[in-house]
Design a protein with these regions (language model features):
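Conserved CoA-thioester-binding segment of acyl-CoA-metabolizing enzymes
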Residues: 1-45
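Terminal peptide-recognition signature
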Residues: 6, 23-24, 42, 54, ...
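A secondary-structure boundary/capping signal
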Residues: 9, 44-45, 51, 91, ...
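Short strand->helix junction
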Residues: 13-14, 48, 125, 167
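Crotonase-fold acyl-CoA enzyme core
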Residues: 80-170
Length: 170
């Protein structure tokens, strides 16, 4: 039995795209089917975990579908269907969709440099990635409301007592 390491990369900020989410979902489905894998460690390459959804580049949000929002959420839903335990290793910014990706994991381990934000209010749109369900469930409605309504960034050490991360490590 083993822990599988699943790394993703979309430099420089590891923005979430439909293609990136599809790749993660496909990899997680394969790992679910592998009886030798007990758990998955999800990590990003580079200094940033995921700085949000790619809303502007030609490879971003709407690049792969006539209904990009539907395609994006279809891939997000696939991530949440994983049966094996997932530990997210968050080494940098986890903003917007990046926060959602971290919350798709069962556990979150973060470096002191990690930053978390649900900055949707600053962008003028509704929180995505299932965050209106997952964030209050993990950190409680009061802290979730604070994150949603301010859009502020929080250091890993600040959100450890809230339960947003499970461990703080170098």
């Amino acid at each position: 039995r083993k822990v599988a390491l699943l790394s993703f990369s979309n430099p420089p900020y590891n923005f979430a795209t439909v293609a990136l989410l599809r790749g993660l979902a496909e990899a997680l489905e394969q790992l679910d089917a592998d009886s030798s894998v007990q758990a998955v460690c999800l990590q990003a390459e580079g200094k940033v975990f995921c700085a949000g959804a790619d809303l502007v580049s030609e490879n971003g949000f709407g690049a792969s579908s006539e209904d990009p929002l539907r395609e994006f959420y279809d891939q997000v839903q696939r991530l949440f269907q994983t049966r094996k335990p997932i530990v997210a290793a968050v080494q940098g910014a986890a903003i917007g969709a990046g926060l959602g990706l971290a919350l798709a994991a069962d556990f979150r381990v973060a470096s002191p440099q990690a930053r978390f934000a649900a900055n949707f209010v600053k962008l003028g749109f509704h929180p995505g990635f299932g965050l209106t369900h997952t964030l209050p469930r993990v950190i409680g409605p009061q802290h979730a409301a604070e994150m949603f309504l301010t859009g502020d960034r929080y250091r890993a050490g600040d959100v450890l007592p809230w339960g947003l991360i499970d461990r703080l490590c170098e």
